[in-house]
Each structure stands twice: as C-alpha cells, then as structure tokens.
Amino acid sequence: FSNKYKNESKSRLELINKFMEQDGSYRVEQNLEQIKKKYNQNLEEIKSAYPEQLATLKREANKQRRQANIRKVLEEAEELMLGVKPCWVMSPLVASQILPRKEIFDIVIFDEASQVTTPAAITAIARGKKLVVAGDSKQLPPTNFFKTQLDEEFESETQDFSSILDIMDILIPAKGNKQLQYHYRSKDERLITISNVCMNYDLKTIPGLDNLNAVKFLKVNTKTPSERGSNPDEVLKVCEEISSHMETNPERSLVVVAFGSHHMQKIEDLFYREYEQKSHILKYIQRWENTVEPFRIKNLETVQGDERDTVILSIGYGRNAEGKVVYRFGPINQENGNRRLNVAASRAKEEMIIISTLSHEDLEDSRLRSEGPKMFKELLKYFQVEYEAPDDQKGLAGLQTLKNKNLTKPPMNPIEKQIQRSIERMGYIVEPQFGASGYFIDFVVAEKSNPGKWLLAVEFDGARYHSSKTARDRDRLRQLNLERFGWKFFR
C-alpha cells in the first residue's frame, strides 16, 4: 500500500507540475505569439487596402515643419492609424481634442473612474461602441480643492463632485458589476487591513512572510503647538526619516503623504533647503527620478493612483498653544473624509511609517462626529497597537482593535491537529490558519527563540484545496501568489 501510494502521489505531482508549466509561462507565450501574428496580418491587409492613407502618413512623418495636427491626420488616415496602433491611452480631455466625433474604437475603458467627472467622461464615451468603467467608489471623488485662512488654524475645504463611476452604479444593475476579490499590492496584510475593514471591502489579502517590520508608529513628543495643520517638530522628524530611508533602504521607493497642503509645503521647504544636497539623498533621488515610482512629497488630494515600497504618512495636526487638541482636520472632517484616509492608508507595498504628535488616546470619541475623524482615530490606534505588539502577536494585535471585525477561521480536522502537536513537540511554534482576511495558510512555523519570524508554511490537500473552482486557482495561482510574497513552496 505504501509503495502504491508513493507512486500515485509521484504521478500526481508530475501531472500538476506539467499543468503549471503549460498553464503558466507557456500559455502566456503562446497567446503573445497569436496576438503578434494577428496584428501583423491585420496591418498588412490595412496597408494594402488603404495605400493613400499610407502615403499621407509617410508624407507627414517626413515633414520637418508645419506638420498637421493629430486630429487632422487621424481624419485622413483613420483606418491605417488604428491598424498601426489599435490601443490608445489618453485622458478624457485629450480624447475630446484629438479624436473625431464618432465611434472609432470598439471599447473605451476608464481607469481610476472615481476621479473622472461625468461631463469629462462623456466626450470619451462617445468615441466607442462599448464601455468598461473601472474604479473604486470608496476612494477620492473628483475634487475642487481650495484653501481658506479665516483664522490662525488652517482649514482646507473641498468641493466634491459626482463621478462617472457614481452614474454607472445607478444606470447598471448590480449583476452587471464585477467586484475584485483579492488585494495584491501590499506584501504584508497589515498595510491594507485598515482600509479593508473600515471601508468594508471584504478583500482577500495574502499573508506575507516577514511579519515584523512592515509597520512603524513614530510618536513625536513635543510641546511646540501645531499651526495651520503642521507641527515644526513633526516636520523635522519626517525629514530625518526620509534621510534615514534614503541612506539605509535605497532599493525601496518612497512617497511622503501629508494630511494637509500647508503641512506638505512645510516638509518640502525644510527637506529641499536643509537635506537635499546630502550625497546619499542626491543619489537616491537620481536613482528613482526617471522610474514609475519617483520620490515625491504629496498630500491626501494628490496621492491616489500612486504606490511605493515605503510610505511615510505624516499627520501634522496636533495641539494648540494651550495644549488642547484642535479637532479641525481639514478635508478629513468633511464629507468623504474617510475616503481620503482610505487612499492614504493603502499606498504602501512593503512598509508604512506613521509620524504624529497625536496618539489615539488623545482623541475623545464624543468630539468625532463624522466618518472621517472616526476612521482617523481607528487608523492611529491600529498602527500604534500593531507597532507596539510583541513579535508573536503582530498581525493580530492591531486587527483586534478594529470595531465590527469578527475573524472566523476554519476549523481544524483531526489530521491537522495531530500534525500540529507533532511539530510543537519538536520545539517549534505553530500558528494554525494564519492570515487576516480569509486567504489562510493552514500552518506557519517559527522557532521559539524567534516568534513571529516564520520559517515555513504547511498546506494540506484538504477541504479548501478540493473546493477550489478551477485547477488554475488550486494548483498554480495559489502557489504563485504565496511565492511572490516570500514563501517557499514544497509539495
């Protein structure tokens, strides 16, 4: 029986490995070849069918000056230009400026649709036969951001508008919407948990291997009052943290997100005046400047769509000259304030650093009336508790602080319990059903001398495996995702 089982197991693993190879890179390569072949075939047919358009394009390309604008060339050589470049990327404004007023594309796709107003979207929608709208209605809406200085405290005001995403939610039945189920950006679940819970996303997040150093909460102890949403001691701490990151982690991209525009400006002024000329900082900035993730200092209104390895989130708000907390948190106080926090709290891929003169204990619940300030306190509490938790409690300590979060883990079967006891008798720590959002790993194992530093993940061929809807999910994608997050996989 033993040899028979081993032979069957070996044959099954060989079959799985063959499937993974054919369903993975081989399948992608085959699809790419088919697309290239179809593209080249279509292009040759179009060039043969429209020789006058080819002549027009060549004539314009050879001109040294007085070239026709794109709209005019497109009107004269539409079929050929779309054949050469079947996929165009542009903003709705550019679409209205250069595209003919007719349906020239088969599909129009909007990305980050929550930030596109309906009037701006209509001009692009009219250029296509079908429409796909992708976006997150719980992130920033289109915003007209302006500032007032009515008194010594800085108050940012925003006027939010409805987006094309809001309109589509009304026009299209729920069954016409496709909801994403997984979050892939953050390599540690704690970097997305606050958004996942507070905004009711119910996304499955993948447990990361390094469960210790993804979160920092740096409290700035100061008696200096905050003015107009910025504290000078916090500004200094932010600049020091930027410098430290650029020196010790040059391989990681970085963005600084300030809660208010005035606070952002103060950080920029100090950093570029006192720090920029340091050699390691110049080297870091040059290294990242021409990439898709350059170093930037931004505010809540301008960071949507960005992602970086490390995010420094600087609060700025604090106490006045009398030592009292000022509950004026700019756009966070207003409608959609929680959506602004959601954007800021979900930009990090590897590390989130919170810098603040306030802790969650400083904020009185009775003073927090709207959703934005309430989530602000939850954010401070989550990251502070998680950062201060013992190593063997990281990943769960912060989660337990969040309201209305009931984490139900699947029960263990007798075989799993027996294996857990066996591993523990060998002197290791075993954490069953490891994870924070439903994408559980059956067991993770650590040494008693180094709790929280996971060495190994153990997965069983059990109920979850057999309940997977497709072989791709079961045998390829789950392993691929876990390996991407640092886990070594053994079958």
Please give the residue ranges for each predicted region:
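Short beta-strand-loop-alpha-helix junction that forms the active-site gateway
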Residues: 440-479, 484
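Core RecA-like ATPase module of SF1/SF2 helicases and allied nucleic-acid translocases
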Residues: 212-353, 427
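Conserved nucleotide-binding/hydrolysis micro-motifs of P-loop NTPases
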Residues: 94-95, 137-141, 147-148, 184-188, ...
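Conserved helicase NTPase catalytic core signature
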Residues: 1-104
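Helicase C-terminal subdomain and adjacent C-terminal extension
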Residues: 147-178, 196, 271, 322-434
